[in-house]
From Swiss-Prot:
SUPFAM superfamilies according to UniProt: LuxS/MPP-like metallohydrolase
Required co-factors: Fe cation
Superkingdom as given in the UniProt entry: Bacteria
GO molecular function: iron ion binding; S-ribosylhomocysteine lyase activity
UniProt keyword Metal-binding, yes or no: yes
Lineage summary: Bacteria, Pseudomonadati, Pseudomonadota, Gammaproteobacteria, Enterobacterales
Keyword set includes Ribonucleoprotein: no
Residues reported to bind Fe cation: 54, 58, 128
Organism: Escherichia coli (strain 55989 / EAEC)
Protein name: S-ribosylhomocysteine lyase
Pfam families in UniProt: LuxS (PF02664)
Biological process according to GO: quorum sensing
Length: 171
C-alpha cells in the first residue's frame, strides 16, 4: 500500500492549533490545488468531541469560504480527520499559511456568534447523516480554545520523519 503524505510527518512534534501545507499538486489543466492540515488538537493528547466536531463541520465550511475564497482561492472541501484532531481543507490556489490562519481565526469568531442550534446549516434528516449528533456548545468550546491558544504554522521540514525512522516503522 502506498505511504500517504500525512503519515510521513512526526505527529509527536506537531503543534496545535496550527496550519500546515499537507500537499500541493496541479490538475492536468495546470490549476494549483493545495491541501491544508488544520490541526485543532495536539495528536495523541487531545481530541475533539464527536458532537462538537460534527457541528463544527457544518459551520466551519461556510465560514471559511466567507473569509478565504477570492483572490485566486476557492475552497473545494473541508472535512474532519478520522482521528478527530483536525480538518483537511482542499482548495484551488496557493494561499500562504498566514492567510489561512487568519481566515481560520475569523471563522472561529463566527462560530461563537451562532446563538442557537437551529442556526446550524443542513441540520435536518434530509441533509445530514446523523442530524441528532450535534452540540453547538461543544463547537463553541472548540472555537474558543482555538482563539485563546492562537494559530501557529507547522513546517513540513521540521516535522518530516527521517527515512531511517520510516524504515524502522516498516513503512
Amino acid at each position: 500500500m502506498p505511504l500517504l503524505d500525512s503519515f510521513t510527518v512526526d505527529h509527536t512534534r506537531m503543534e496545535a492549533p496550527a496550519v500546515r501545507v499537507a500537499k500541493t499538486m496541479n490538475t492536468p489543466h495546470g490549476d494549483a490545488i493545495t491541501v491544508f492540515d488544520l490541526r485543532f488538537c495536539v495528536p495523541n493528547k487531545e481530541v475533539m468531541p464527536e458532537r462538537g466536531i460534527h457541528t463544527l463541520e457544518h459551520l466551519f465550511a461556510g465560514f471559511m469560504r466567507n473569509h478565504l475564497n477570492g483572490n485566486g482561492v476557492e475552497i473545494i472541501d473541508i472535512s474532519p480527520m478520522g482521528c478527530r484532531t483536525g480538518f483537511y481543507m482542499s482548495l484551488i490556489g496557493t494561499p500562504d499559511e498566514q492567510r489561512v490562519a487568519d481566515a481560520w481565526k475569523a471563522a472561529m469568531e463566527d462560530v461563537l456568534k451562532v446563538q442557537d442550534q437551529n442556526q446550524i446549516p443542513e441540520l435536518n434528516v434530509y441533509q445530514c447523516g446523523t442530524y441528532q449528533m450535534h452540540s453547538l456548545q461543544e463547537a463553541q468550546d472548540i472555537a474558543r480554545s482555538i482563539l485563546e491558544r492562537d494559530v501557529r504554522i507547522n513546517s513540513n521540514e521540521e516535522l518530516a520523519l527521517p527515512e531511517e525512522k520510516l524504515q524502522e516503522l516498516h513503512i
